[in-house]
Structures are given as structure tokens and as C-alpha cells.
Amino acid sequence: MRGEGESWGAITIVCGLSNGKGVAAGIDLRVKAEVEILDEDKVCVESFVLGRREEIGVKLVESLRDLLRSRYEIKGGIRAKIFSEIPPERGLKSSSAVSNALVIAALDAIGERVDEMEILKMSVTLSRMAGITRTGALDDASASLLGGICAADSRKMEIIMRKEAPELPVVLRIPDRRVPTSSVPDLSNSSQRFDELFSMAISGRWMEAMLLNGYLMCSLLNYDRKIIDEAISLGALSASLSGKGPSFAAICDEPEKLLNWGDVVSMLR
């Protein structure tokens, strides 16, 4: 039994790490997963990032085997191949994208058809089982799978809002270093400020909320806010630290003006 699945990256509009309520926007960096159900009880993972072999998704695949066993009584093991355009642990929602793609591929392999919300619930469960998320990151998972601007309450497992994203380029500034979620301090003391940004975003002022989120996250995590100021001065419509960093994202209509600021040009999707 074999199956395929795909999902995409996303950027942060409002970070949900403080209270589980976040907003994210899909971008067109893709993750593809191939899953084969094995007779033998073992897990095999091959993974490639930007065409180069790199270990990602092992904990997710191990947890996927357990999830399929408990939910669908699928015995045996899993062989998975993961092909990602998203550098891991850079704040660009690679974990959510890999989790989504693996769930879709596994369901395809066993012949199960479920709706998008059920895919998201399984993906969040998978991420929690693998221990790679604090909140469940439903906002990231939904933006990754569905595209558009997605606001969600991960603790209540509710999508609060989804709207189509404008057709605008996104310039990404992606440092070489990784920042695992486990290294990020507790942000719960700032939950009221993030609540205000969440309300601003779902009221329609999501670009303004994104910018203010960037300044707040830079202050809390000791990033240089001048990186955001530079993007705005070069014509960006909005910019922010994405997730817990270290990547920054700038939404713009003239990406060529930011090519010296960033590394990768993507698109909202």
C-alpha cells in the first residue's frame, strides 16, 4: 500500500506560542511525502531538503505508525520519503507542512478519504505525539494545507477565520542557523498583547498586525528590529519575524527592491 501527499510552507502573521491563538499565511514552498505501509514493523525515512539529503521528519513518521495503528488498526511499519523546499527549524512551518503531507500520504496509502478538517486534526495530533509543538499549531497547519490567511485557536482546535490571500510576493530572509521550538522561552506573560494582535488580524488589519507582531517578537526573543525597519524602508507592505525565527518575511509588490535584504522570493497562496 502506497500513497502520496503534499502541503506547503507558511509565514507568521501573529505568533500563537503565548496562548495558542495564532494567524499564519500560506506560501508556495512545497513539501511532498510518499508513504508505503510495510509488513515488517519498522520505520524507514529518506528525506531531502532543497534536493540535498537531510534528516527531517523521523519523529513524525514514528508517530504516524502509532497513529495509524491506534486509529485504523494498521499493523506493520512505514517507509517514507520526504521532499521539502522548506529549510527546517527556520520559522517557515516546515514541521506542519511535513506532518500534513505525511497524513495525506498515509490516508492515500490505506484508502481512507476524510475531509480537510479531519486531516488537520490528525496532523496536529501527529505533531503533538512527536513532541515537536507546544500548542498544536493549528494556525500553521491550516495555512500550510489550505493556503490563505488562517486564524486558529489551537487549544480549542477551532479555525476562527480563513480568507484568500492577495497575490503578492513574499521575500524571505533565511539564516543558516536553526532555532528549535524547544529553545524558545515561555511567552505566556505577553499573551494579552498577542490577543490584541490576534483581534486586529481577524478584523481585517492583518498586515498591520503582522508588523506589530514582528516588533513584539524581536523584543521578546532579542532579534534586531532594524531588519524589519529595513524591509519597510525598501518598500515592503509588511514584515515580521516568522514563528520563533530566525527567518524574517516581507510581503511586497516589488520584490526586486528587497533582493539584497532577503534570500528567497516566494508567493502568498
Model-derived segments and spans:
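ATP-binding N-lobe of GHMP and related small-molecule kinases
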Residues: 1-90
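Short beta-strand scaffold segments in enzyme catalytic cores
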Residues: 11-15, 31-35, 140-144, 149-151, ...
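Short coil/turn connectors at secondary-structure junctions
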Residues: 8, 30, 76-77, 138-139, ...
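C-terminal nucleotide
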Residues: 3-8, 34, 38-39, 110, ...
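Phosphate-handling active-site elements
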Residues: 71-79, 106-123
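DPxDG-like acidic metal-binding loop motif
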Residues: 92-116, 145-147
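Alpha/beta catalytic cores of group-transfer enzymes, especially the acyltransferase/condensing modules
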Residues: 117-161, 228
